[in-house]
């Protein structure tokens, strides 16, 4: 662990120096050169009046004459940033810049960091709606639960463009993609799995919903938060989201914590806090168990300990271990596919298509216990995911088929 701490300390200092040297990691680049007065007249006044007139006559043409089609807003209120917590909009800006450069480097998408100086749900929704004319999609980021669920749901309902809270759906897509490949190795069926999910924030809730939509049996799922196992009738630490989950899961109303949840489990998914899973817990799982311990920077259990205790496949959220389950595997391709069809929304079918496409990037020959998910830098990831998402966009009627007629 001391070596691990030294490595992180070195990365922190290197990152700090880079941000100071560059004064941020993002800039705006021009697509045109202004060498003459004529150039200026075409790019700006008076020439720019003509695309303005066209868009005024048909709002859908904004996708043809402006940056909107390939532009995403990365929006946060700074209330739940990485493992740092509620650090506010100013301190959240480096993370949003980092997200924006991933969009650009991986998918060629222009993304702008938007850090809102409010954590009032209604004000966040109102601000994003007012900004929407500029963007082809909205990526909500690092907004605390349960507020994030309402903010995303309302914006999806009220805006005519793709809105996704990446901490929810990006995570769920990557987890399910990894699980699809893990199940090929352990030769188990999704509907038969006994599953334990630790953490019921944005990621945990979205993973639960995604698994059930994909075919997992909710009656075979146990969920656990900081207050222990969730069950119908529990009073402490509940909210309306957890109450919905409680009605579907844990039919025996098992009480206690993770220790009581682990026996005979086939799959553990952790999106909670580091070091809370013991080797004895993993040892009590079913044969050929799968452990996805994604707390950062310290997983719920370290991979070597999980393997030592009998886990067949182990994944984490870290790049220095095999099987890194990282959102950057999903959101660039997801948005590229959605923006490419000028989609009005991101549908469940598009998310599911993204997960299957991501899983299939790993070929049969490459698949192994230490390789269930592609490397984030693998060049085939974004094109594969984007193509699948674009196809699903048309199939689920989310795409704008004719921009000349769209409003």
What are these regions (language model features)?
Residues 1-163, 386, 392:
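N-terminal ligand-binding/catalytic initiation module
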Residues 5, 166, 186-188, 293-404:
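Adenosine-phosphate binding glycine-rich loop
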Residues 30, 34, 45-53, 90-97, ...:
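Electropositive phosphate-/nucleotide-binding environments in soluble metabolic enzymes
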Residues 77-79, 87, 116-117, 142-145, ...:
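Short, ordered loop/turn segments at secondary-structure junctions
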Residues 82, 89-107, 159, 165, ...:
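Glycine-rich phosphate/diphosphate-binding loop of Rossmann-like nucleotide-binding domains
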Residues 132, 190, 261-262, 282-285:
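A short, aliphatic-rich alpha-helical micro-motif
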Residues 139-142, 267-321:
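ADP-ribose/adenylate-binding Rossmann-like module
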């Amino acid at each position: 662990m001391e070596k691990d701490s030294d490595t992180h300390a070195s990365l922190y200092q290197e990152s700090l120096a880079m941000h100071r040297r560059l004064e941020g990691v993002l800039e705006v680049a021009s697509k045109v050169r202004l060498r003459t007065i004529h150039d200026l007249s075409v790019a700006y006044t008076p020439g720019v009046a003509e695309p303005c007139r066209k868009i005024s006559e048909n709002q859908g043409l904004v996708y043809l004459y402006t940056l909107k089609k390939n532009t995403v807003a990365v929006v946060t209120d700074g209330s739940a940033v990485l493992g740092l917590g509620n650090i506010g909009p100013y301190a959240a800006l480096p993370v949003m810049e980092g997200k924006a450069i991933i969009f650009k480097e991986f998918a060629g998408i222009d993304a702008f960091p938007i850090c809102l100086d409010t954590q009032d749900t209604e004000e966040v929704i109102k601000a994003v709606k007012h900004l929407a004319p500029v963007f082809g999609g909205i990526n909500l980021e690092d907004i605390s639960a349960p507020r994030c669920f309402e903010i995303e749901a309302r914006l999806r309902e009220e805006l005519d463009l793709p809105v996704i809270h990446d901490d929810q759906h990006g995570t769920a897509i990557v987890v399910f993609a990894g699980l699809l490949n893990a199940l090929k190795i352990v030769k188990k069926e999704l509907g038969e799995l006994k599953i334990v999910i630790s953490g019921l924030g944005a990621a945990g809730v979205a993973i639960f919903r995604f698994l059930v939509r994909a075919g997992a049996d909710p009656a075979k799922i146990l969920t656990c938060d900081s207050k222990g196992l969730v069950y119908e009738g529990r009073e402490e630490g509940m909210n309306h989201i957890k109450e919905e989950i409680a009605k579907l899961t844990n039919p025996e109303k098992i009480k206690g914590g993770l220790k009581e949840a682990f026996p005979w489990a086939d799959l553990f998914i952790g999106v909670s806090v580091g070091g809370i899973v013991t080797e004895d817990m993993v040892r009590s799982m079913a044969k050929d168990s799968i452990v996805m311990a994604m707390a950062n920077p310290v997983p719920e259990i370290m991979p070597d300990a999980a393997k030592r205790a009998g886990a067949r496949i182990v994944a984490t959220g870290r790049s220095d271990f095999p099987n890194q389950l990282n959102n950057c595997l999903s959101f660039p391709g997801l948005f590229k596919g959605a923006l490419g069809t000028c989609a009005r929304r991101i549908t469940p079918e598009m998310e599911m298509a993204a997960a299957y496409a991501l899983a299939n990037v790993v070929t049969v020959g490459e698949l192994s216990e230490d390789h269930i998910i592609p490397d984030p830098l693998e060049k085939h990831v974004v094109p594969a995911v984007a193509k699948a998402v674009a196809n699903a966009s048309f199939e689920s009627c989310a795409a704008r088929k004719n921009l000349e007629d769209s409003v």
